[in-house]
Amino acid sequence: FPTRRSSDLIGFGYIPTDKRFVANYKDGAWDEGGLTEDPNIVMNECAGVLQYAQTVFEGMKAYTTEDGHIVTFRPDLNAKRMVDSAKRLEMPPFPEDKFVDAIVQTVKANEAYVPPYGTGATLYIRPYMFGINPVIGVKPATDYQFRVFATPVGPYFKGGVKPLTLCVSDFDRAAPHGTGHIKAGLNYAMSLHAIVTAHAN
């Protein structure tokens, strides 16, 4: 495993780990969910997430402390924010206690990938959920999937935080009273044009 031997070489990117958590919402209820080794998602070409961007996500990290413990910081707050995000996009909230348990299960199943203390690297944890059944015509999906994967990453700002060159434009990422206050995939897609344009200039 590269993190154990060369943590300084890991960037902020995706490296597959052993297991991820998956739960499904169908017929008005979430199932118990569980861990799987399969990193792939199979869905219909007309899935709600593909047609109408009905997806929300969170992000957090697990890291090794100086005394060798593996910890995360306040996953309960991420659980609450995902509930708020889901409600805003008319998605069934994933229960907060099950959210935290899914994080714990995923980290434990991939603890070999948590970088050692002092490397500056961490295990990035990505919980997300999305509408998975076919939807044509603008309306909420009826079936959903909640997933958590983890991947070892180096510092987001490699080499530390440095002064930035700013680019000011009249581009709006989110409209007033819209979805700017939640972690929805559509908000981040809206920022891509501004990011690419800024780097190009």
Model-predicted regions and their roles:
Residues 4-109, 135-201:
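Helix-start/capping segments and mature chain N-termini
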Residues 104, 118, 124-133, 137-140:
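Active-site periphery "cap/insert" segments of enzyme catalytic domains
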Residues 95-97, 113-122:
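Flexible, glycine/charged-enriched surface loops at secondary-structure junctions
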